[in-house]
Amino acid sequence: MKFVDEAPIFVHAGKGGNGCMSFRREKFIEKGGPDGGDGGDGGSVYLEADENLNTLVDYRYQRSFRAQSGEGGRGRNCTGAKGEDLILPVPVGTSVIDMETEEVIGDLTKAGDRLLVAQGGFHGLGNARFKSSVNRAPRQTKPGSEGEDRQIKLELKVLADVGMLGLPNAGKSTFIRSVSSAEPKVADYPFTTLVPSLGVVKVQTHRSFVVADIPGLIEGASDGAGLGIRFLKHLTRCRILIHLVDVNPIDESSPVESARAIVDEINKFSPTLAQRERWLVLNKCDTLSEDEVAEVERQIREALNWVGPIYKIAAISNTGTAQLCEKLLGHLEVLWQKERDNEELAEQEHEVQLQMQQEARERIALLQQRHRAAKAAAKGRALDNDDDDEDDDHEMEIHYVP
């Protein structure tokens, strides 16, 4: 199934039913009085997180959704039926944004979470509501109010604890295949990974974490080059980022420059994401001698001013991967426990995630704006060239041969 992580849609809540104007008419009962009932409330529109979904592709083909309107009231004080609510299923991890105000309406991060996105209209009032001691036969009713209309954007961000960063062919997908049951495509050419993939890493029974792989970044990604920039937003929910560096690239490029390029692109994309806890992992260490690996490690430390630990693995042969996953899970469990014990810390983490997501949206919107401007300029140049050709046709000389 095609992976779609963004979808703009229109939602329309149902209109409230109108109130009824009616008077009681029965044999032997004179001046029976008003008995017009109220209308029914309009249906509302909700989004509900469904753990069985993993893409927003269905919302690419249908963009408008409308809840049922309430029925009008009837005589004998009968109230109209309420309009049925419309519940739209979305994947877990979906953020909802009001496209008019650019305000984040809410996040659906757990299966079963439900979010109101369009409130149904209020029911109208029948003429029985307006009866009083001075107005025994009111001919006044109140119509139901209109339901709320909204244009919203759905943004899916995968829910993972650990996110993978690296250039194409650094071995990110191989790492996920080696530590989990996930089977992302692996090949010896760049951009094998085209969409994010998730893997559940089970260290022990009932002890696990989720790792996410996104398409590789290249130099200039923050300016729109390559595939990875639009998927970086999926890392905003990750607690730890793994920066995977190929110590022996097949194209003979410098591992030091590769590591520096990723750091630069992250800084340009989102300063807050760049401050996220990041673990540096050297991959394919089995292709070099210990002294050569040590030299690469020394150069990377100097180039990045790296003071933390550097882990050395060979994902294809599972060398060092089990120890790395054990340390990752142990650290994650400490972070999770701190947030459970300290609500203020959990709230700070939530604010940091919101800030990263906002920066990601702004950067992607800027790149889209640049792309549209460049496309329009190219189209304009093409039209100018066509006009020049037409002018040349009008100015060409015609010679008649006698």
From Swiss-Prot:
It is found in: Cytoplasm. Residues 160-333 form the OBG-type G domain. CDD domains: Obg. Mg(2+) binds at S173, T193. It comes from the Bacteria. One of its GO terms (biological process) is ribosome biogenesis. Monomer. Its EC number is 3.6.5.-. GTP binds at residues 166-173, 191-195, 213-216, 283-286, 314-316. Residues 376-402 are annotated as: Disordered. InterPro entries: G_OBG, GTP-bd, GTP-bd_Obg/CgtA, GTP1-OBG_CS, GTP1_OBG_dom, GTP1_OBG_dom_sf, OBG_GTPase, P-loop_NTPase. The keyword GTP-binding applies. It holds the Pfam family MMR_HSR1. Its main location: cytoplasm. Residues 385-395 have a biased composition (Acidic residues). This is GTPase Obg. GO terms for cellular component: cytoplasm. An essential GTPase which binds GTP, GDP and possibly (p)ppGpp with moderate affinity, with high nucleotide exchange rates and a fairly low GTP hydrolysis rate. Plays a role in control of the cell cycle, stress response, ribosome biogenesis and in those bacteria that undergo differentiation, in morphogenesis control. Residues 1-159 form the Obg domain. Belongs to the TRAFAC class OBG-HflX-like GTPase superfamily. OBG GTPase family.
